[in-house]
């Protein structure tokens, strides 16, 4: 049986198809300097958020002497560290959640259909690439894009699907949904 060579044309086409499902957004680009004996060497640092708009999202950081190379490195880094976030009705969060990183703190709240993405700066890029359509987000503390993105990811990692909550509590999913509807936190459609 003949083995295909690594890096063959078919492999490249499959990689391009896999990569085409992702949407990437450039969040921040900074000029950075490395001090060497002869002076300063300037380069660029990029922060990129990547997602499939179906619940998977990741962020990456890349540095290089040229902007396009920094963006490429950041995009590759983001694709390696994707997380899955369960969405209610494919559009919003299941419950309100807090996240923090360093001095950056965020509060993410689920929203009614038609609300849109009410979020500032770097958080908006995360929600758009995630595929979330309705969310209200508030950031406090540090407005550094790196801290805001990491705090947003911290909050999203704490998002739990109601089926998992029901399993932990030893309840049936339908019972949990009935309680949610009775308390007024059910689907608002």
From Swiss-Prot:
| SUPFAM superfamilies to which the protein is assigned, alphabetical | dsRNA-binding domain-like, Ribosomal protein S5 domain 2-like
Q: What organism is recorded for this protein?
A: Allorhizobium ampelinum (strain ATCC BAA-846 / DSM 112012 / S4) (Agrobacterium vitis (strain S4))
Q: Which family does it belong to?
A: Belongs to the universal ribosomal protein uS5 family.
Q: Which PROSITE patterns match?
A: RIBOSOMAL_S5, S5_DSRBD
What's a single GO BP term from this record? translation
Q: Does the keyword Ribonucleoprotein apply?
A: yes
Protein name according to UniProt:
Small ribosomal subunit protein uS5
**GO cellular component labels:** small ribosomal subunit
């Amino acid at each position: 049986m003949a083995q295909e060579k690594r890096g063959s044309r078919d492999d490249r086409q499959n990689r391009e198809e896999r990569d085409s499902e992702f949407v990437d957004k450039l969040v921040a680009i900074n000029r950075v300097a490395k001090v060497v004996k002869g002076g300063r060497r300037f380069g660029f640092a990029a922060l990129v958020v990547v997602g499939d708009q179906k619940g998977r999202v990741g962020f990456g950081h890349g540095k290089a002497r040229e902007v396009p190379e920094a963006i490429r490195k950041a995009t590759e880094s983001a694709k390696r560290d994707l997380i899955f976030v369960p969405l209610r009705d494919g559009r919003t969060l299941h419950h309100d959640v807090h996240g923090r990183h360093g001095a950056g703190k965020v509060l993410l709240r689920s929203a009614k259909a038609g609300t849109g993405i009410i979020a500032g700066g770097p958080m908006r890029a995360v929600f758009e690439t995630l595929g979330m359509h309705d969310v209200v987000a508030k950031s406090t503390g540090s407005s550094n894009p790196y801290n805001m993105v990491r705090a947003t990811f911290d909050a999203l990692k704490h998002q739990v699907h109601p089926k998992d909550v029901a399993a932990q509590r030893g309840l049936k999913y339908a019972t949990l949904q009935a309680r949610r509807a009775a308390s007024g936190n059910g689907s608002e459609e």
